[in-house]
Amino acid sequence: MTEKLQPLRGMKDLLPDDYKVHDYIINTARDVGVLYGYKQMSTPIVEYTKVFNRSMGESSDIISKEIYSFLDKSNDFVALRPEFTACIIRSLISNRLQHKLPLKFFSTGPVFRYDRPQAGRQRQFHQLNYEYIGAKGAITDADTLKLAVDILKALEIEQDTTLELNSLGCNESRSVYQQKLVEYLNDFKDQLSKESKIRLSKNPMRILDSKSETDQKIIANAPVLSEYYTDESKEYFEELIQYLDILGVKYSINPCLVRGLDYYCHTAFEFTTKKLGSQSTILAGGRYDGLAKIMGNNDDVPAIGFAAGIERIALIREYNISEVKPVFVLPIGKNNICYALEIVDKLRTENIAIIIESLGKIAKRMQRIFNENAQFIIFIGDEEQANNNLKIKDLKKEEEYIVDFAKALELLKK
């Protein structure tokens, strides 16, 4: 028996109804981004693995467990992109765009992570991605956060989300804090989860967002990052809060919201929802001023960005999206097909969506048309062809018209 072929586990086909929703989400988000000056760009789905090794660090969960990396036929290690930010910064450097800063980029497309598939978490999924590169300061962060809010508002899900906000401080703040955190956690080393024991030596700040109940009890009394802010870090965060209040952006400060990599600084944020169970984050981002230099640029480049999961957005709200319903042209006999093709071509040049139904018996063709919930059918038989006119049936109004092409056009464009 021939094996029934299926997509890979955790990867799904996007059928027309799914694609319609994805398209709506992308177009809506793109339109909001345009109002903020963002321009769309794309990068290859496949990059050298070292692009992500540099950006995420080999000890990160994505690199150590989730990345799709393999040796290609040129004996190079390449990877399916697990996120956009590293690709965008790689593009900035390889295309020598530094002299054009600041730049605002919007990207969208599939990303890949080898994870345990579940609702809202697949191995291939799609993201909206925004990067504001070359601009520093709390005003830039506030503008980016307001963009995220406006996108969620345009998608009618803002009311279902909470903005969780934190400041990672400057490098000096974080360095002192990390030392104090490790000192504290070392006293509980034997009680930490297996995952957190590994992180303690490689990426201790990531322990703060552990989901383990045991870890959570230990973290509850851990030192708080804000206690180690320098004056600069305090002023930066206070300024951001002031701007968000002016803009009317609601937020909740979460001191455990962190980014475990050294190039992140100051603002970190997530928009979460209670509608998706454990997969509660639908949009997340932060400031990453140190990434460009790590990836080979001569200097640091200030930058902030975020990504949102399209599949998760689609799970929060059911979108009823209207679409253009095509007009169906039904030639009665084979001898009417040539005339029908002429009519179809003329109507399409007038931007009218047309499907010609010429296969099978009339009854079966009519059934297919009814299944499409069409409004108009154009019947073309010998009489219509001889008189150079069209018989149009309006299925919603249950009316029938025999008209010339000009009148038909007027009727179909109403």
From Swiss-Prot:
Keyword terms, alphabetized: Aminoacyl-tRNA synthetase, ATP-binding, Cytoplasm, Ligase, Nucleotide-binding, Protein biosynthesis
BP term (GO), one: histidyl-tRNA aminoacylation
Any one GO molecular function term: ATP binding
Major subcellular site: cytoplasm
Subcellular localization, as worded in the UniProt entry: Cytoplasm
Its EC number(s): 6.1.1.21
Group of enzyme by EC: ligase
Signal peptide (from-to): none
A Pfam family that the UniProt record links to this protein: tRNA-synt_His
Record keyword Transport present: no
Catalytic activities: tRNA(His) + L-histidine + ATP = L-histidyl-tRNA(His) + AMP + diphosphate + H(+)
A cellular-component GO term for this protein: cytoplasm
Family designation: Belongs to the class-II aminoacyl-tRNA synthetase family.
Oligomeric and partner information: Homodimer.
Protein known as: Histidine--tRNA ligase
Source species taxonomy: Bacteria, Pseudomonadati, Pseudomonadota, Alphaproteobacteria, Rickettsiales
Gene giving rise to this polypeptide: hisS
